[in-house]
Amino acid sequence: MKIPEKILYAHEHTAIDLSGPKNNIDCRLDDFDATVAEYRHLVERGVVSIIDQTNRGMGRNVAYTEKVAAAAGVKITHATGYYKEPFLPPECYTLTEQQLSDIMVRELTVGIEDTGIRAELIGEIGTSKEITEPEAKIFRAASRAHAETGAPICTHTTLGTRGMEQLEIFKSFGVDLSRVVLSHIDLSADLDYMKRLLDQGVNIAFDTIGKCNYQPDGSRAMWLSRLCREGYENQIVMSMDITRRSNFADRGGVGYSYLLDTFAPMACEAGVPEQTFEKLLYRNALRIYKGQSEASV
């Protein structure tokens, strides 16, 4: 199949460090040369932009990420917000909902820390299998920041769960669900659940491609085909969400280009029309995260 000329990866982490709570150094990404090599290969395949979902408490390093972007020749968009327990920094427990929202607004409108580089989205904010009160507080704070700035929001769902509960919080604040992406929904094996979410007007991400220890990619391809055939192709974005060094190609992993080289042809064979991939791999994410403007990509 012919992949689109322009591609936008909707959920990645250029620098991330979840190694502490996970007690696993593999969950730290900080190898500059290896990351640049992976990203350069993506650029060769047509990737023009990457949405970096790393936020406060996840090991975000904007200066490092900008150096990777410059070396690889790709645009990287930065995020603000907080992840989920047990990865939340102390401020999530000591500050009020409004104070947390104010931090997000500042990073969106003024800049992240002392870099002068502004975040362009709130993400990835997450929930555990059961939503904890600190996590709910972050969702409320993010909703307030969205109301003030109009910034898009990306969430983390644990194995695809609690999507409806996340939406209920957003709805209570009047969040524009067309600017919201629920991540990792491809980890849910429930196609009806996926459709119920999409029927709310929200977007979902098939962004754990290649993580076959959770779900086989053949199933992902089948679900994607069904959703596209049933008219949801404008509400789905795609990515790899690589967070482990062992996922890199030079470490024997699938590598970032697996989505384009292996999964996209698999999904095409499963029934996703070739022309639909421009939406799945570029246009949808452009609309959600960039407001259709290609000038900022």
Regions found by a protein language model. Give the residues of each.
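Catalytic pocket-lining loop regions of alpha/beta-barrel enzymes
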Residues: 147-222, 226, 236
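Short acidic/histidine-rich active-site segments
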Residues: 53, 207-208, 232-253
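Divalent metal-coordination and catalytic microenvironments
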Residues: 11, 50, 82, 146, ...
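Mid-to-C-terminal alpha-helical segments outside catalytic/metal-binding sites
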Residues: 1, 258-297
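Alpha-helical scaffold segments that flank or form the walls of functional sites
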Residues: 5-10, 24-53, 58-75, 98-116
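Acidic/histidine-rich helix-loop elements
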Residues: 16-30, 90-95, 247, 251-252
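Histidine/acidic-residue-rich catalytic or RNA/ligand-binding cores of hydrolases
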Residues: 18-22, 62, 163-169, 191-197, ...
